[in-house]
C-alpha cells in the first residue's frame, strides 16, 4: 500500500498509585498481521510492549484541586522497529479493520473502614460507643478488585474476627504475579489499624 501508518494505543492511569512503564504490558491483536507487512519473526513485537513513559496517577494538590493523569502511548510497530504497518493486499474501496489492544498492568486498592474495640467484648455496657458484632461500612478506591461486605465478629472477651468479600469488577482477568498462589496470597492484604479509645471504660 501507499499509506504506511502506526497504531497508537493511549493509556490513562485512573487509579491511586503511580506505575512504572515496566509494570504495564500492551499487545495488539484482532487482525491478520501478515496483511500489514508483519513477518512471522516480528509477531512477538506486537505483544508485551511497555508505554513510552510512566503512567502517573492523578494527584490532588495542597488546595484540593485534582491534577488529572497525563496520557501515555504505546506505538505499534514500536519506535525502535522503525517500520510502519502497510497493507500489502489490493484494497478496492474503504474497508474497516479492527485492532484490539490488550493491557496487563499492576494495580493497588485502598480500603478504609471502622472497627469496634471494647475493653470487654462480651459484657457490653449500655452506653458503649459502638457495636462489635455488626457489618461495617467500607470505603474502597476504584480498582478491578475491591473489598465489600466487611464484617466484624466477637470470638472472645478480648478477641475479634474480621471477614470480608473480595469482588472482581469489570471485564478483565486477574493474574497473580507469583505463580505460587499460596505465596502470592501473603501479599494481597496489608492492614493498618488505628485504635482511638473513647473512654477508659470502653
Regions picked out by a protein language model, each given a short descriptive name:
Residues 1-202:
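Non-catalytic macromolecular-recognition regions in eukaryotic signaling proteins
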Amino acid at each position: 500500500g501507499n499509506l504506511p501508518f502506526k497504531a497508537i494505543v493511549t493509556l490513562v492511569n485512573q487509579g491511586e498509585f503511580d506505575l512504572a512503564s515496566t509494570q504495564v504490558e500492551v499487545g495488539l491483536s484482532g487482525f491478520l498481521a501478515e496483511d500489514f507487512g508483519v513477518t512471522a519473526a516480528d509477531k512477538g513485537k506486537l505483544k508485551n510492549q511497555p508505554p513510552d513513559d510512566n503512567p502517573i496517577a492523578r494527584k490532588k494538590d495542597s488546595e484540593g484541586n485534582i491534577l488529572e493523569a497525563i496520557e501515555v502511548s504505546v506505538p505499534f510497530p514500536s519506535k525502535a522497529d522503525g517500520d510502519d504497518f502497510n497493507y500489502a493486499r489490493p484494497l478496492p474501496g474503504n474497508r474497516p479493520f479492527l485492532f484490539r489492544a490488550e493491557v496487563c498492568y499492576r494495580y493497588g486498592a485502598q480500603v478504609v473502614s471502622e472497627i469496634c474495640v471494647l475493653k470487654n467484648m462480651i459484657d457490653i455496657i449500655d452506653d458503649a460507643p459502638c457495636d462489635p458484632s455488626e457489618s461495617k461500612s467500607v470505603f474502597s478506591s476504584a480498582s478491578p478488585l475491591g473489598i465489600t461486605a466487611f464484617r466484624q465478629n466477637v470470638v472472645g472477651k478480648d478477641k475479634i474476627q474480621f471477614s470480608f468479600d473480595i469482588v472482581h469488577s469489570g471485564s478483565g482477568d486477574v493474574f497473580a504475579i507469583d505463580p505460587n498462589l499460596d505465596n502470592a496470597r501473603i501479599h494481597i492484604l496489608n492492614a493498618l489499624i488505628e485504635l482511638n479509645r473513647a473512654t477508659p471504660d470502653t
